[in-house]
C-alpha cells in the first residue's frame, strides 16, 4: 500500500532474586515435544535474530519472475534531464485510497530550483489566486522545508529514474487521502506499469489548500518518505511514518493531534502500523502515527538530534526494534532499544523533563506539546485484581489510589511466551514462517529430482495473512538453476494485478477468509507434471511493498509423494533467506515499572521478574507521603502483533 497521509519516607520492597524457569531437559534428537514452551520460544528468538530477509529488488523480481530474462533492466528512462517548460500538460497515474489507479491531466504552472509544481486541470480555482498560493508554498518549500528535511534525514535519490534533479509535486483532487508518496514512481514502467517515472509527491489540495501551513506540512511529511526510501529502503512503516510526522515538527508545524491520539490509547503497539484495512479505524491509524512520532521525537531529543536521525536512516541492514539497538550503540549510548523504550513509557505518562536528567519527559518545541498518557484502569479498593491483555511494545497504566490501607502488596504474573503468528502448527509442533516486514523479499528454496517420474505434485498446507492486492506469496519453479522462475497457479492463488505488484499467481489476503480453510490452514496441491523427467528448483517466496504488512505466510506438511519426499522437522536441504523454522513462540520479555507520585516528586522503580514472568513488590506510605502509584505494564516481544496476557493482584 502507498504511504497515504490520513489528517518521603516511602519504601518499595522488591525481591532481588529471580527464580529460574523450569524446563524439561533437552536431548540431541531434535524432537521439539520434549522442550518446554519457554525453551522453544528462546530458540525461535535466536533463529529469528539470525534470519535476515533480503530487501525487495524490483528490477531482479521483474527480470526473473515477469520477463523470464537474464538481461539487466536499465534503471533510467532517459539519459539527460528533461528541463520541462512551464505550461506543459502531462498525464499522471494516481493511486486510489484502497486499491487500483486512475489517470488525470495536470499543467506545470511553476518551476523552482528543486521542484516542478503541477496542478490538476479544471480545479475551478481562479488562475491568479492559484498562482499566488502556489508561489507561497513553493517559496516555503525551497527556503525551509527542503533544507530542513535534508539536514535531519539526508537527501533523496537524485537525479533519479528520469535523470532530473527536480521533484514533481502534483496538486490535485485525491479522494480519501491528504497526500502520499509512492516508491513505484522511481522505476521504469517495465517494472511497474503505473509508474510515473519521476520523483513525485502528491497533495490533495481539496483537503490542504495551497499556500497554507497544512499544505506545507504535508510536503514536509511526504518529502521525508522520499528521502527515507533512498536512505533506508527496508525500514518498517511505523519508523518511516514516525519520521515523517517528526519532519512536520522540525519544519515548524504540529503533529496534527496524532500525539494526543496515541496518548489517549497507549495500548497501541509501537512496532506495528495500520491504515486502510477495514478493521483499522481512523482513530487507531492516528494513534499509530502518534506512537511512531513520539518514539522518533524522543530519540531525536534524547540521543543526538539530526545526528540520531541520520544514524537511523544510515543503518540499511536492520529494521524494527532491532534497528535501535544498533543505532544507539553507534551513537555511543549505553542504552539499547528496550532501555530507551522503558524510559519512553514513563515519559509518555509523566512528561517531566526535569526528572532523571530529562529522561522522563519532552522539551516542548511545538504548539500543544506534549502528552500525558491515559490511565488504563484504576482502583482505590483492595484487594484488587486485573486480568488483561496488552499489545507488544505498548503499555497498560494501572493507577493505585489511597483506599483504606497504606501498605499494598503487588503480585504480577504474565504470559512468559507469545505466539509469532495467530495459528497452530499442524504437525510436530513446527512450521515454516516467511518472516514479515516492509520492502521484504524472503525465499525458501529446494532442489527436487523429478527425472525418474512421469507426473508429480507439490503438496503442502499453507496459512497466510498478507496485505490484499499489495503483498503476495508465491510457489515458483526454476528449470535453469534459479536464474529465472515461474510462479505456479494453485487452488488459492490469483493472477489479478490491480496495483502492478503480482508477479504471476500469488497468495494475497487472509486465508482464514477462504472457503475450505481449517483454522486458517488451506491444503494446496501444485501440479509439477510439466516438469517431470527433469531436475528443478522449487521456491516459496514472500514479497511485500513499501508500506504496511501483516503476519506473513506459514507452511507445513510439504511433500512430493511421487518421489517419496516429505519435509522433516529440520532444515536440511533448504536454502533459507528470511524464512525460519519455528515452534511459533517468542519470550514475552515483560517490563513492569512503578511510578510513585510522592510529596518530594515522582520516583520510578523497576519490578524484577523471574524468567517465567512472575514478580512482586510491597509499597508503603500510600495516602501519606505517596499520593498514588501507577503500574506501567509493557510486553516487549518483537516481530509479533499478538497481545500478551497478565494478572496484577493488589492486596
What are these regions (language model features)?
Residues 456-464, 536-543, 631:
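Extracellular beta-strand-rich recognition modules
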Residues 188-196, 213, 217, 232-303, ...:
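Acidic/His/Gly-enriched intrinsically disordered linker/tail segments
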Residues 528-548:
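Extracellular beta-strand ligand-recognition surfaces/modules
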Residues 7-15:
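Bacterial N-terminal signal peptides
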Residues 22-154, 158:
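N-terminal module-boundary/linker segments of secreted carbohydrate-active enzymes
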Residues 111-237, 243, 251-272:
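Juxtacatalytic substrate-recognition/specificity segment
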Residues 476-535, 566, 571-591, 598-615:
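Exoplasmic/lumenal beta-rich domain surfaces
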Residues 22-29, 36, 318-443, 461, ...:
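Beta/coil-rich, acidic/histidine-enriched accessory regions frequently appended to metallopeptidases
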Amino acid at each position: 500500500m502507498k504511504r497515504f497521509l490520513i489528517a518521603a519516607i516511602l519504601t518499595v520492597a522488591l525481591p532481588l532474586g529471580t527464580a529460574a524457569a523450569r524446563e524439561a531437559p533437552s536431548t540431541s534428537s531434535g524432537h521439539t515435544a520434549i522442550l518446554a514452551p519457554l525453551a522453544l520460544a528462546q530458540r525461535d528468538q535466536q533463529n529469528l535474530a539470525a534470519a535476515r530477509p533480503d530487501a525487495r529488488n524490483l528490477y531482479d523480481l521483474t527480470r526473473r519472475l515477469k520477463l523470464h530474462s537474464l538481461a539487466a533492466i536499465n534503471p533510467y528512462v532517459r539519459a539527460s534531464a528533461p528541463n520541462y517548460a512551464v505550461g506543459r500538460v502531462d498525464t499522471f497515474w494516481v493511486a486510489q485510497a484502497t486499491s487500483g489507479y486512475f489517470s488525470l491531466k495536470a499543467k506545470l504552472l511553476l518551476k523552482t530550483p528543486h521542484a516542478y509544481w503541477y496542478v490538476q486541470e479544471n480545479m475551478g480555482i481562479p488562475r491568479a489566486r492559484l498562482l499566488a498560493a502556489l508561489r507561497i508554498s513553493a517559496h516555503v518549500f525551497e527556503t525551509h522545508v527542503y533544507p530542513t528535511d535534508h539536514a535531519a534525514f539526508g537527501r533523496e535519490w537524485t537525479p533519479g529514474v528520469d535523470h532530473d534533479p527536480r521533484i514533481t509535486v502534483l496538486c490535485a483532487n485525491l479522494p480519501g487521502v491528504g497526500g502520499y508518496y509512492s516508491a513505484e514512481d522511481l522505476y521504469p514502467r517495465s517494472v511497474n506499469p503505473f509508474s510515473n517515472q519521476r520523483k513525485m509527491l502528491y497533495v490533495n489540495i481539496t483537503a490542504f489548500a495551497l499556500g497554507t501551513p497544512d499544505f506545507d506540512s504535508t510536503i514536509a511529511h511526504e518529502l521525508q518518505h522520499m528521502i527515507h526510501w533512498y536512505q533506508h529502503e527496508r525500514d518498517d512503516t511505523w519508523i518511516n511514518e514516525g519520521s515523517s510526522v517528526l519532519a512536520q515538527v522540525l519544519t515548524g508545524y504540529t503533529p496534527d493531534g496524532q500525539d494526543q491520539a496515541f496518548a489517549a490509547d497507549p495500548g497501541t503497539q509501537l512496532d506495528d502500523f495500520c491504515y486502510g484495512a477495514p478493521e483499522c479505524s481512523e482513530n487507531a491509524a492516528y494513534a499509530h502515527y502518534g506512537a511512531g512520532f513520539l518514539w522518533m521525537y524522543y530519540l531525536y531529543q534524547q540521543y543526538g538530534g539530526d545526528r540520531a536521525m541520520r544514524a537511523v536512516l544510515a543503518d540499511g541492514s536492520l529494521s524494527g526494534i532491532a534497528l535501535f539497538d544498533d543505532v544507539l550503540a553507534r551513537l555511543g549510548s549505553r542504552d539499547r532499544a528496550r532501555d530507551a523504550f522503558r524510559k519512553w513509557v514513563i515519559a509518555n505518562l509523566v512528561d517531566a523533563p526535569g526528572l532523571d536528567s530529562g529522561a522522563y519527559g519532552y522539551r516542548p518545541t511545538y504548539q500543544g506539546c506534549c502528552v500525558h498518557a491515559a490511565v488504563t484502569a484504576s482502583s482505590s479498593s483492595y484487594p484488587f485484581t486485573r486480568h488483561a491483555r496488552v499489545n507488544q511494545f505498548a503499555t497498560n497504566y494501572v493507577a493505585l489510589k489511597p483506599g483504606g490501607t497504606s501498605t499494598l502488596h503487588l503480585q504480577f504474573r504474565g504470559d512468559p511466551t507469545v505466539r509469532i503468528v495467530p495459528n497452530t502448527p499442524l504437525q510436530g509442533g513446527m512450521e515454516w514462517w516467511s518472516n514479515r516486514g516492509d520492502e521484504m523479499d524472503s525465499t525458501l528454496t529446494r532442489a527436487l529430482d523429478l527425472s525418474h517420474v512421469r507426473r508429480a505434485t507439490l503438496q503442502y498446507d499453507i496459512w497466510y495473512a498478507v496485505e490484499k492486492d499489495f503483498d503476495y506469496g508465491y510457489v515458483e519453479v526454476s528449470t535453469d538453476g534459479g536464474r529465472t522462475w515461474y510462479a505456479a497457479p494453485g487452488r488459492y492463488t490469483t493472477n489479478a494485478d490491480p496495483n502492478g505488484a503480482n508477479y504471476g499467481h500469488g497468495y494475497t489476503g487472509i486465508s482464514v477468509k477462504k472457503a475450505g480453510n481449517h483454522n486458517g490452514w488451506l491444503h494446496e496441491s501444485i501440479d509439477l507434471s510439466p516438469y517431470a523427467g527433469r531436475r528443478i528448483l522449487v521456491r516459496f517466496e514472500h514479497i511485500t511493498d513499501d508500506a504496511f504488512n501483516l503476519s506473513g505466510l506459514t507452511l507445513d506438511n510439504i511433500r512430493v509423494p511421487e518421489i517419496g519426499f516429505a519435509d522433516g522437522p529440520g532444515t536440511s536441504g533448504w536454502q533459507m533467506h528470511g524464512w525460519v523454522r519455528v515452534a511459533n513462540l517468542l519470550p514475552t520479555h515483560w517490563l513492569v515499572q512503578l511510578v510513585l507520585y510522592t510529596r518530594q516528586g515522582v520516583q520510578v522503580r523497576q519490578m524484577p521478574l523471574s524468567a517465567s514472568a512472575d514478580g512482586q513488590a510491597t509499597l508503603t506510605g500510600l495516602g501519606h507521603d505517596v499520593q498514588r502509584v501507577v503500574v506501567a505494564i509493557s510486553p516487549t516481544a518483537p516481530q509479533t502483533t499478538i497481545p500478551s496476557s497478565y494478572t496484577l493482584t493488589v492486596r
